[in-house]
Amino acid sequence: MPAARKRELTTPDLVLLSLLAERPMHGYQANAELERREVRDWAGISRPQVYYSLEKLAQLGLVRTSETELPAAGPERSVFQTTAKGRAALADTLEREEWATHRERPPFLTWLALSWQARPGVFRRQIKRRREFLENELSREEATLRSIKQEVGHRFHEAVWMVSLMIGQFRGELRWLRKLERELPRRAHAKHTVVAVR
């Protein structure tokens, strides 16, 4: 891997820089806190990735090992904290334009585009699966929101805004699915198909 790519900060790197700016932690604590915060709902970061990122960030001087009363036992017991250089790198990365201009490609939309090729009955079954999934996720996020509000003590916090956005998106998609089910009997092929010509 080229050196420039190794220095490029990934989402897991940024999540850890932010977490370790709050307070020093060792890898196990960081994993436990990320799990408690349900970070995997909004950032792709696995347990092994935490340790890989900690090592990378330490090599780049973006985190440092702090003193601990625990005996040295490898990365599990090394306590890391974000350095001033790490906070600056995080702040610089958060200014990039692509945070606000990237468009997601949800797998369900890909499925919908290809669904006209599905066997009879599959469309309705998949819509039902999607609806059930969204209803479960909505319930889970509503419970998460109650928990967050209790923990932070107000509604003007990033976590509240993030979960509120997800709740709004789930509700919006559920409304759209109901509309889709109503319109399904009228589904038809395109009337004016255009083919690209070289």
Language model region names:
Residues F170-E183:
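Amphipathic alpha-helical coiled-coil segments
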Residues P120, I127, F156-A159, V163, ...:
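Amphipathic alpha-helical coiled-coil segments and their boundaries
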Residues M1-R103:
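Basic helix-turn-helix/winged-helix DNA-binding cores
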Residues A91-S139:
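Amphipathic alpha-helical dimerization/coiled-coil segments
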Residues E183-R198:
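Long amphipathic alpha-helical coiled-coil segments
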